Amino acid sequence: MYLCPNKPKLQSTKNFKIMDYKIIDIEGVGDVYAEKLTAAGINKVSELLEKCADPKGRKALAEATEISEKLILRWTNHADLFRINGVGPQFSELLEKAGVDTVKEFRHRVAENLQPKLEEINAQYNICGRVPSIAEVQKMIDQAKELEPKMTY
C-alpha cells in the first residue's frame, strides 16, 4: 500500500507520530539546504516539524539558516503530511500540487474527488510511481481526521 517502499521506522514524540525521514528526503531540500538545516540542529523531518510548526519557530529557523520562511513553511507542511501512514516525500509533493498541504487540510477532503485529481496531476508531472486507490486515499483521510493538527499560522 505504501507509496514509499524504503520508509524509515516510525518514531513517537509526545504529541505525534512521524516516519522519521532524514531532512534531505523532503522534496526540494537538497544538499545545500540540508547542510544549513543540519548546522541549525535539524537532521530529521520530525525535528523540523517540532521546531517549525508555529510561525515563531519558522522565523527563528529562517534567521538562523538564511533560508526563506516560505521554503521552511513548505517543507514543514510536507513534514506534517508525513505523519499520515503512506505519505512520504513524493506523495506529499503530489498532495501539495492538489491543494492539500497539511493534515488539517487533508481531513476535509473527499476521496472520490481527490483521487482523480491526484491521477490527473501525476499524469501531468509524473511525481509518484503510482497514485493510491480511492480506498487508500480514504484510509489516509480517516487517519488525518484522527491526528491532532500541528501547524499554526
Residue ranges and their predicted role:
Residues 14-153:
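C-terminal extensions
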Residues 2-18:
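Short, Lys/Arg-enriched N-terminal segments with co-localized hydrophobic residues
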